[in-house]
């Protein structure tokens, strides 16, 4: 098993309801370690650039608007097989299909306001982490 790092974003629907601590506890209970974390207000340019891969999808505009609707918590999580473990702990994108105990089953309001984002591959994790964090902001 390899120690990996992945990007996690606690989205505006969750920060608005002060769920950061509860979500962090789910991650940590699953064996993921928070090695960087910051609470920020994304600009439209930042959110648009981050989600540029979805630019041609019908939900892109709404996604960008949602991601700038309030503060987000950006995190780098570390652990054994962190990318897959984080995705398992987040649960299905649609909270109605998310397994009990997952972040989305517990906290998501809808498929759009689903509380968290997580990298979908190790390659994307590295790209996404570098988008938001300087190496000096991440614990060794």
UniProtKB/Swiss-Prot annotation:
It catalyses: a 2'-deoxyribonucleoside 5'-diphosphate + ATP = a 2'-deoxyribonucleoside 5'-triphosphate + ADP; a ribonucleoside 5'-diphosphate + ATP = a ribonucleoside 5'-triphosphate + ADP. Keywords: ATP-binding, Cytoplasm, Kinase, Magnesium, Metal-binding, Nucleotide metabolism, Nucleotide-binding, Phosphoprotein, Transferase. The keyword Lyase does not apply. One of its GO terms (biological process) is GTP biosynthetic process. It is an enzyme of class 2 (transferase). One of its GO terms (molecular function) is nucleoside diphosphate kinase activity. PROSITE patterns: NDPK, NDPK_LIKE. It is found in: Cytoplasm. It holds the Pfam family NDK. Its EC number is 2.7.4.6. CDD domains: NDPk_I. The active site is at residue 117. One of its GO terms (cellular component) is cytoplasm. Its cofactor is Mg(2+). It comes from the Bacteria. ATP binds at residues 11, 59, 87, 93, 104, 114. Belongs to the NDK family. PANTHER family: NUCLEOSIDE DIPHOSPHATE KINASE, NUCLEOSIDE DIPHOSPHATE KINASE DDB_G0292928-RELATED. Major role in the synthesis of nucleoside triphosphates other than ATP. The ATP gamma phosphate is transferred to the NDP beta phosphate via a ping-pong mechanism, using a phosphorylated active-site intermediate. Homotetramer. This is Nucleoside diphosphate kinase. It comes from Gluconacetobacter diazotrophicus (strain ATCC 49037 / DSM 5601 / CCUG 37298 / CIP 103539 / LMG 7603 / PAl5). The gene is ndk.
